[in-house]
Amino acid sequence: MSETQSDPIDVSKFKNGDDVHFDYNSTTNDQTINSTNVQKKKKKKKSKNKHKGSPNVEATLNDPDVEYPTSRVIKQAPNGDVIIESLDEPSDAHTKSVTANIWDNATLEEQENLKAFWESLDEAQKIELVKIDKKSIMDIFKNESKTVNTSNNHQNNSNTQGGSTSTSGGALNGSSTNVNIPGAPSNSSNGACTCSYCGRKNNFIEDELENIYDNHFDDIIDFIHEVRDINDLNALPGLLFGGFHMLEEEHKLQKRQQKYKYKQERDAHHDHHNHEPGHICSDTGSSGDYDGSTQQDQQHQYEHEIEHAFQEDEHEDECGHKNDHSHSHSHSHTENHNHSHSYDPNHNHSHSHFQYDQIEELNNEDELSQEAVLQKSLDDELNKELGDESNNNQSSIATKEQRVFHKLLDPKLFEALENLDFEKMKDTPANNHSAHILEKAGSLRDIIRDLHKADKVELEKGMAFLQNMGKIFSSDMSNAMNHDTLNDQISNGLSSFAEDLLKNDGNSFIDMMESLSESRTAREDLLKEKFDKEPSAAWIDEDDHTKSDTDISIPKPDLHQVQELEEELNDEYDEVDEDDDEGEEEGEEEEEELDDEEFEEDEEEDASDTESEISEEEKMQEIRRLFLIQVIKLFQERLKNAYKEKLSQDRTRTLIEELEAEENAKKEREMKKLRQKEKAKEKKRLQQLAKEEERRKKEEEQKAKEEELKQKQEALRAEQRRKKEEAKQKREEEKRKRIEELKRKELEHQKRLEAQRKKEEETKKLKDEKKKKIEEERKQKEEEKRQKELQKKLVEEERSKSAKKQDHKETGSSEDISQLSRDLENARLGQNFNIPSPVVPDTLLAQPQEPRVKSPTKNHILDQLYLAKPRSLSNSTNSTPQINNVTPGYIPDLSSNSMLPSVLSPSGHNILPNNGNVNNQAVPSPWSSQAFNANTQAPPVYQPQLSSNAFSPFNSSLSQNSLSSNANENLNTNPLNTTGFNEPFATAAQPSSVWNPGATSRNNSIWSNSPNVASNSTLWGNSVPAPPVGAAVGGNPNSLDSDLIQAAAYQAFQFLQNSNQLEFGVAPSLKLFQTAKTILSNQGLTLNQFLTSCRNTGSLSGYGFDFIYDDFGTVTHIKASSTNIPQQPPHNNVNTQSINSLGLGNAAVNDNESSLLNTLSDINNNPNSFSNGVRGLWN
């Protein structure tokens, strides 16, 4: 027996799986040592000896639905299986057999599940499960035999004391016989034996089973159908779960019947319950301790417990019957019902209180305790009836026996015997003896089970059996017998094959078949030898009430025989008590040996031919039961396999569903991650869109701002254009006013011309007078000529240069005009020296009259004035009427006049080689569509024009005739910067008028004078006396600086042009400025001074500059050009005459001076006529 059964484990040592206890037997320790030794070997031997320890055991789970315990103890069963027990509850000392069937250990819930599974099957599947065939049944027998032999082998190996091995078989007639097989090996029951004897024995058993199956198949099937109709598929689960016992419905039906009968009997014999209990309480040495009243109270207590059990059964059966047992009694004793007496082991006080308390303490379950109470109560009732049967009259025997049968038929007795756990009772040494007694009475289960089928004849046989029992245990004999002996006799008499079948699942029958085949002859001889002997004092087996005749009477044994039987039983039970500690299996073997001995004794005393027939009948009954058990096991195995297959399929399906669910969850997580990623991408995209939208809004705002700024600029430019338009309109309005003013002046001029013509007519008369004075004037001019020699030498070189380019085909009128001018100057000089001027020739006086004949009747200048447009000022053109040189004496205050520009040369001589005159041959009139080129130097007021492009506001044609000047060398030329008025003192050689488009010279203006100087027909009125020789006229001190800057600017422009730095023929203003400043080596020169000097048209450098402006009026580019023109050589053949000979008096000079000043005043009053100096009148 293993150590796990003898040494219980203290559960309090282990908490929540903190420690795991491994419990091994001796064989396991040896295996551990062997495995340790194997590890110490070399590596090449490890693979060979690696699996020498324990063989591979297939893992099976008795209850796969139970959760694996966290707090557990791992054990090893005797057969090597691993047992895992939970520590939540105290572990039972008894280890469950691993070979136990799943149906025996199944809970109610599992059985319900199996029933539900059976009901869920269709009819074809049910028929397939309950199909009976020979091969399946024989396979179950073989497998069972192998399993039992293997289990016995392990038990024998684990047994340390090692008792002698014997072959025990179930005895016929309910007794056992110890048959020692001569020559048989000690391990004949060991399935591991491979000897020829054991093989022949196994083959013999199988052959005998096959013969029994073939010969008695119909009888077996009929018996199976008697127990349960296996064709009733709906009722089969009850057969499978309940074995061949009665089903729950049959139990309930019989319970209700028996309870009703029991209640009637109890009411009828209520007075009998108050008597002294009939059970024998023969306490050695203390037989008088319990009086009648105490025993009566105990009996009442037993009856109350039985009634309580019946009431519970009635409640379960849903019957409305209630216990109307209304007798009242009170227990006055204070004795504890759970008390335990310290009796001697041989002195067992077995009254019902004591046994009930022991059973309750062992089982700790209400149901099991109640069943134990019922068992003991019914035993007491049986003993009581047996005692009463010997004391009462013979007339009441039938009634008493009837009550005993009712007690035996009580279903509570059956249930109590069915549910008693003798193994648990054996584990406790104090209850071990009582457990053996109750276990020997286990055959009552079969008796009670078969009583409901008994007919009248069998009931009569049972009555005879009870009578014989009453004779054996008579009152005379029971007083001398102790209580233990009586219990032993009862327990030995109630042993049967059903006990072996129920306890060992038919294993005892297999052993019986082995002994039966070997000892049949020996037993027959033994029966024949003892047949003639006198039968000993023995009783008939409990099955005799169903098989024996009513005439069989058992003689009453004498006291000597009873004492001998008592001694033998006491000796046997002493041996049993000593062997209880060796384990369950050894105790069973001792019991079987005891049964065999008793069987031999019974056979020696009671052997007869009738017993042989009875034994054969009982053997067939056991065979039927054995095959019924095997059939039920077959059905159970099939149903178990089908249920396991269904569970496997369900679990596989559940696993697949869980895997699919896990896969779906995984996919769902992946999809969730993908959705999160998509969401993140969408969020990022939305953020990018938001940023893009914000950027677009900023761009739109920026564009809006730019558009707004552009609109503002556009509005500003529109405003500027509007202002320009207004200024243009204002200029046009001013131009219109000037045109009107010019018309008015033209009318006045016409009036003056008319007056002048009248004066000319008068002057004709005077010329005749002056002819006489010509000679005198010539002389005077010669003298002046000598005085001017020095002055002429200074300008001779310049005149020689200009003379080369001068056209020698000048007309005679131009020479006369030059001569006239020299005569006028001589006359002026003569007047200064008080020299009489000669008379002007008549030819000169007659010339101015020709243009008047050609004058048209209509003035065309008005149309040109209306069509003329304002042009930008050009520094290379002169758009204003030129003012010819006049004598400083005519304008004595000209240098200090604020109306004159500040560009008059301070030097006392002419800078240009043409003596201050500029010949600009390519300048159109101010009313043409060409740009105006400004002369860098205007001719002196007192000097006639030499160029052929002299300005004439009434003539757009150009004349190739130039005027030659014979100015005095001792006079300073005072040019005007911007004004270009023609010489008002025109000589007779140039008599062209305003309406003469074919004139040879353009120097006639609207103020053009007549050739007759003496007529004083000029714009400025009469002439004034000439200043003395050498008198200086005020000039501009900055004229030389402007000339230097213009010359440097022109050189810089030429440098940029040669180095290909020009842009479309023009130079950038800043680059030109930097280059000019480098040339001048003047770092203090500013851009404003540079531009002002370049705009200075009164400079004598002879260079012109064109400017290009941007939209804001800033100079961006400048173009430079040269305007130097050679001067005309002087004509010295003009006679020097006195001013007086020309008939010019002071009045005439004063009138001319007044007219010139008025004209300059008009020009100065116009604010738009000047830009960076004095601008032209129509610019």
From Swiss-Prot:
Its main location: cytoplasm. Residues 39-53 have a biased composition (Basic residues). Residues 149-178, 282-299, 957-977 have a biased composition (Low complexity). Residues 1-64, 147-189, 255-351, 537-619, 660-819, 928-947, 957-997 are annotated as: Disordered. Keywords: Coiled coil, Cytoplasm, Stress response. Residues 10-22, 262-278, 300-347, 663-681, 690-812 have a biased composition (Basic and acidic residues). Residues 564-616 have a biased composition (Acidic residues). InterPro entries: Fungal_stress_NST1 (IPR051195), NST1 (IPR025279). GO terms for cellular component: cytoplasm. Residues 648-810 form a coiled coil. The keyword Protease does not apply. Residues 24-38 have a biased composition (Polar residues). Pfam families: NST1. Belongs to the NST1 family. May act as a negative regulator of salt tolerance. This is Stress response protein NST1. It comes from Debaryomyces hansenii (strain ATCC 36239 / CBS 767 / BCRC 21394 / JCM 1990 / NBRC 0083 / IGC 2968). The lineage of its organism: Eukaryota, Fungi, Dikarya, Ascomycota, Saccharomycotina.
